[in-house]
Swiss-Prot record:
This is o-succinylbenzoate synthase. It catalyses: (1R,6R)-6-hydroxy-2-succinyl-cyclohexa-2,4-diene-1-carboxylate = 2-succinylbenzoate + H2O. GO terms for molecular function: magnesium ion binding; O-succinylbenzoate synthase activity. It comes from Klebsiella pneumoniae (strain 342). Mg(2+) binds at D162, E191, D214.
Length: 321
C-alpha cells in the first residue's frame, strides 16, 4: 500500500537576507513524504524567490497532482519544474535506498569580511581551509580590499567568491585591482563576475582569477566545455532538477576536469542534510557550499549536526495531502 503526504512550511529568516535586491523575510516550502510497505522517503520542494522560474504555488499544484497519482498506484513522470523534480526524486531515492546515508557536513563558511570571525570558524575545520564571500553587494573596491585582507591574514585560505553577475567589466577590474596578484591563485574561483559569459571570460584572461559557472548552467545555450580560466561549476539541485540530472551535470563537469560544487538554495535543515548526502556521493573530493542554515530561525524535521537552532517537528507543519 502506498501513502503520500504533502506538507507546507514557513520559517522566519535572518533580517539581513537580501536576494536580488529583495529582502527575504521568510523561507517557504513544501515536503513530500512517500511510504510504501515498511519504507519511507522525504523530499523538499522550496523554489527560491528571484532564482527559481517557478513560484511556490505552481510547485504546490504540480506536487499535489504527482503525489495523488503516485498514491493511487501510477508511476507518473517527474514534473518539469526543477524544485519539484528534485524534491520528488530525493523522496524516491530515499524510499528505494538509492540515496546513500553517508553525508558531507563540511561547509565552506560564509564570511562577512571579518578575519577574526573567520579565524574562529576555520580553526575547527579539518583539512583544507575554504570559505565563501559574497561580492557585488557593495562597492567593487571594498570587495577587493576585503578579499585581499582575508587572503593576507590567513595564508592557507582558499576563497570562493560569488558575484551573481553583479559587475560590469569596469567594476570587475576595480575589484581585481585591489587583490594582490600574488594572492589571486588562492581564489579557488569567482562565480559569474559579469553579466555575460563573454565578459566573465575576458575578466579571467586579464586578471588570472579563475571563474566558475552557476547561473549559466540553467540557460538553454549552455554547454559543458573545458576552457581557459574556467575551474568549476556550481550546481544548485533545487534550481537544476532531478537527482538524475544533477548526476549528469556532475559527470559532465568531471569528464572535463572541472570541479563540481553541490550548493544550497537556502533549503531547510531537511533539504540541507539531503544535499550533504548528494555531495558525499557525487562530489566526495569537494567541500559543498551548504553554509546557509544560520540564515534561518529554526530547523525542520531533521537536524543538521551541531546546529543549536530549535527543531520544528512534523506535527507543526501544515498538511495539504
Amino acid at each position: 500500500m502506498r501513502v503520500s503526504q504533502v506538507y507546507r512550511w514557513q520559517i522566519p529568516m535572518d533580517a539581513g537576507v537580501v536576494l536580488r535586491e529583495r529582502r527575504l523575510k521568510t523561507r517557504d516550502g513544501l515536503f513530500i513524504r512517500l511510504q510504501e510497505d515498511e519504507r519511507e522517503g522525504w523530499g523538499e520542494i522550496s523554489p527560491l524567490p528571484g532564482f527559481s522560474n517557478e513560484t511556490l504555488e505552481e510547485a504546490q499544484t504540480a506536487l499535489l497532482a504527482w503525489a495523488q497519482a503516485w498514491r493511487d498506484g501510477a508511476e507518473p513522470p517527474l514534473p518539469t519544474l526543477p524544485s519539484v523534480a528534485f524534491g520528488i526524486s530525493c523522496a524516491q531515492a530515499e524510499l528505494y535506498g538509492e540515496l546513500p546515508q553517508a553525508a558531507d557536513y563540511r561547509a565552506a563558511p560564509l564570511c562577512s569580511g571579518d578575519p577574526d570571525e573567520l579565524f574562529a570558524k576555520l580553526a575547527a575545520m579539518p583539512g583544507e581551509k575554504v570559505a565563501k564571500v559574497k561580492v557585488g553587494l557593495w562597492e567593487a573596491v571594498r570587495d577587493g580590499m576585503v578579499v585581499n585582507l582575508l587572503l593576507e591574514a590567513i595564508p592557507d585560505l582558499q576563497l570562493r567568491l560569488d558575484a551573481n553577475r553583479a559587475w560590469t567589466p569596469l567594476k570587475a577590474q576595480q575589484f581585481a585591482k585591489y587583490v594582490n596578484p600574488a594572492y589571486r591563485q588562492r581564489i579557488a574561483f569567482l562565480e559569474e563576475p559579469c553579466k555575460t559569459r563573454e565578459d566573465s571570460r575576458a575578466f579571467s584572461r586579464e586578471t588570472g582569477i579563475a571563474i566558475a559557472w552557476d547561473e549559466s548552467l540553467r540557460e538553454a545555450d549552455f554547454r559543458f566545455v573545458a576552457e581557459p580560466g574556467v575551474r568549476a561549476v556550481v550546481i544548485k539541485p533545487t534550481l537544476t532538477g532531478s537527482v538524475q540530472k544533477v548526476q549528469q551535470q556532475v559527470a559532465a563537469a568531471h569528464a572535463l576536469g572541472l570541479s563540481a560544487v553541490i550548493s544550497s538554495s537556502i533549503e531547510s535543515s531537511l533539504g540541507l542534510t539531503q544535499l550533504a548526502r548528494v555531495a558525499a556521493w557525487l562530489t566526495p573530493q569537494t567541500i559543498p557550499g551548504l553554509d546557509t542554515l544560520a540564515l534561518m530561525s529554526a530547523q525542520l524535521v531533521r537536524p543538521w549536526p551541531e546546529s543549536t537552532l530549535p527543531m520544528i517537528n512534523i506535527d507543526a507543519l501544515e498538511p495539504l495531502l
